[in-house]
From Swiss-Prot:
Signal peptide bounds: none
Function: Involved in carbon catabolite repression. Represses the transcription of a number of genes by binding to a GC-rich region in their promoter.
Protein name as it appears in the record: DNA-binding protein creA
Statement: the UniProt record of this protein carries the keyword DNA-binding: yes
One GO molecular-function entry: RNA polymerase II cis-regulatory region sequence-specific DNA binding
Family, per entry: Belongs to the creA/MIG C2H2-type zinc-finger protein family.
Zn finger residue spans: C2H2-type: 64-86, 92-116
Compartments in which it is found: Nucleus
Residues annotated as transmembrane: none
Pfam families membership: zf-C2H2
One Gene Ontology term, aspect cellular component: cytoplasm
Renumbered residue ranges of the record's region Disordered: 1-31, 97-152, 212-319, 346-420
UniProt feature, compositional bias: Low complexity: 127-152, 276-290, 398-414
Length: 420
C-alpha cells in the first residue's frame, strides 16, 4: 500500500495536474498580500490607521511643515533651518578677522570657530599668524609716517635713508637746492633720531649707532650750533662731525670758521681714511653723504668737487679749502685739490705733505695738472720729456746749458698753463 501511494505521488510530481498547480499558487498569493501590507505600513504618506494611532502616543506632533517638500518639524527653528537648504541662504558669518566663511546653521559656525580659538590646531595657528602678519604690515605702512615725519611732509624721509648707504647714488636731490629745502630734509631725520620707540625701523637704528661710533671729538657740538642756526637744536648729537662740508652753502653769513677747520682736520682724519682721491672708493655708511649730496655741489665726488665748482668760490673763506686739502692728502705726495686764492697757504701745506714739489719754480702749474680728479688728466705731466727736448733745441750745447736760464723753464711752464 505504501509503495503504490509513493508511486502515485512520484507520478504526480513528474506530471503535475491543474489542481496541483492551483494548490501551489495559493501560498504565493499569500506572500504577495503580506508584502503589499508591509509596503503600506512603511509608506510615509499613507500609513495604516491602526499603526498611526499607536505611534502618536510616543512621538510629539509636527505642526511645522516645509512649504517646498513634505517634511514636518517639531520646532520653528528646525523648519527655518531646513528651508535654508532649499534657498541657499547663509546668514551665519564667521566673526574672526580675516575669515570670510558663512554658514546656514549656527552649530556649523560654532564648530568652525573652534578652528580659530583652539591654540593646538595647526590650521588655526597658520590663520592667526597670517592675520598677525597682515596687521603688522598695515601698521608699518600706515602708522610709521606720522611718527617719522612732521605734518605736511610725506615724501622727504625716504631720501636720507637711501642716501646713507650710497654715497654716489643718483637718488639725491638736485645740486642747486637752497638751504631751506635742505632743512626740510634734515628735520625729519632728527625726529627719527629722537623717537626711539617700536615704530622706528632697523635702518634708522643702525644709522644712529654708526653715527655714535664715528663721533670722536666732543667740541663739534658747540661749533655745530654756531655754524648751523637753522637746525642746530635737532642735529647737535648726530650731525656734529660735519662743520665744514655743509658750511659751503651756509658760509657767507658765517666767516669765522678757523677753529672748526682745525677740529675737522684733527678729528675726522681717522674717520675718512678710506677715501683718498677716487670717487668710487669705499667710505663708512653714515649720513655724512646726505649733507654732501644735498648741498649745492655736483653729485660725483663729495670732497674733490669744490675746487672745480664756480658756485663755491664766493662762499669759501681763507682757511676752509686748505684744511680739506690737507685732510684728503694725508699720506699722498700730490694734493687732491687745486690751490684756490692764496699761494702762501699752498706753500705752507706743501711743506708738510709734498716737500718734493717746492724746488721747482713751475710747481704750481704742475700741481694744478696733477690735482685733476680724472686719471687721464693726472697723467699729463708726462710731457716733461718734450720740455727737455725744447730746451735742447733752444740751447746750442744740449744738456750742458739746460739749467742755464730759468726763462726756458718758465716758458715751458707757461705752455703747460696754456694747455689747461
Amino acid at each position: 500500500m505504501q509503495r503504490a501511494q509513493s508511486a502515485v505521488d512520484f507520478s504526480n510530481l513528474l506530471n503535475p495536474t491543474v489542481p496541483a498547480d492551483k494548490e501551489s499558487e495559493k501560498p504565493h498569493q499569500g506572500d504577495v498580500e503580506m508584502a503589499t501590507a508591509a509596503v503600506t505600513v512603511i509608506k510615509p504618506n499613507g500609513p495604516l490607521p491602526g499603526v498611526q494611532n499607536s505611534e502618536n502616543s510616543n512621538e510629539l506632533p509636527r505642526p511645522y511643515k516645509c512649504p517646498l517638500c513634505d517634511k514636518a518639524f517639531h520646532r520653528l527653528e528646525h523648519q527655518t533651518r531646513h528651508i535654508r537648504t532649499h534657498t541657499g541662504e547663509k546668514p551665519h558669518a564667521c566673526q574672526f578677522p580675516g575669515c570670510s566663511k558663512k554658514f546656514s546653521r549656527s552649530d556649523e559656525l560654532t564648530r568652525h570657530s573652534r578652528i580659530h580659538n583652539n591654540p593646538n590646531s595647526r590650521r588655526g595657528n597658520k590663520a592667526a599668524q597670517a592675520h598677525q602678519q597682515q596687521q603688522h604690515q598695515m601698521h608699518q605702512q600706515q602708522g610709521l609716517p606720522p611718527h617719522m615725519m612732521p605734518d605736511g611732509m610725506m615724501a622727504p624721509p625716504p631720501a636720507p635713508k637711501t642716501i646713507r648707504s650710497a654715497p654716489g647714488s643718483a637718488l639725491a636731490s638736485p645740486n642747486v637746492s637752497p638751504p631751506h629745502s635742505y632743512s626740510t630734509f634734515a628735520l625729519p631725520v632728527s625726529a627719527v633720531h629722537y623717537n626711539r620707540g617700536g615704530d622706528i625701523s632697523m635702518l634708522a637704528k643702525a644709522a644712529t649707532q654708526v653715527e655714535r661710533e664715528t663721533l670722536t671729538a666732543p667740541p663739534h657740538h658747540s661749533n655745530n650750533h654756531r655754524h648751523h642756526p637753522y637746525f642746530g637744536h635737532g642735529m647737535h648729537s648726530s650731525r656734529g662731525h660735519l662743520p665744514t662740508l655743509s658750511s659751503y652753502h651756509m658760509g657767507r653769513s658765517h666767516s669765522n670758521e678757523d677753529p672748526s677747520d682745525d677740529h675737522y682736520s684733527g678729528a675726522m682724519r681717522h674717520a675718512k681714511r678710506s677715501r683718498p682721491n677716487s670717487p668710487n672708493s669705499t667710505a663708512p655708511s653714515s649720513p655724512t653723504f646726505s649733507h654732501d649730496s644735498l648741498s649745492p655741489t655736483p653729485d660725483h665726488t663729495p670732497i674733490a668737487t669744490p675746487a672745480h665748482s664756480p658756485r663755491l668760490r664766493p662762499f669759501s673763506t681763507g682757511y676752509e679749502l686748505p684744511s680739506l686739502r690737507n685732510l684728503s692728502l694725508q699720506h699722498n705726495t700730490t694734493p687732491a685739490l687745486a690751490p684756490m686764492e692764496p699761494h702762501l697757504e699752498q706753500n705752507q701745506f706743501q711743506q708738510g705733505s709734498a716737500p718734493t714739489t717746492q724746488p721747482r719754480p713751475t710747481g704750481m702749474s704742475l700741481t694744478d695738472i696733477i690735482s685733476r680728479p680724472d686719471g687721464s688728466q693726472r697723467k699729463l705731466p708726462v710731457p716733461q720729456v718734450p720740455k727737455v727736448a725744447v730746451q735742447d733745441l733752444l740751447s746750442d750745447n744740449g744738456f750742458s746749458h739746460s739749467g742755464r736760464s730759468s726763462g726756458t723753464s718758465s716758458l715751458a711752464g707757461g705752455d703747460l698753463m696754456d694747455r689747461m
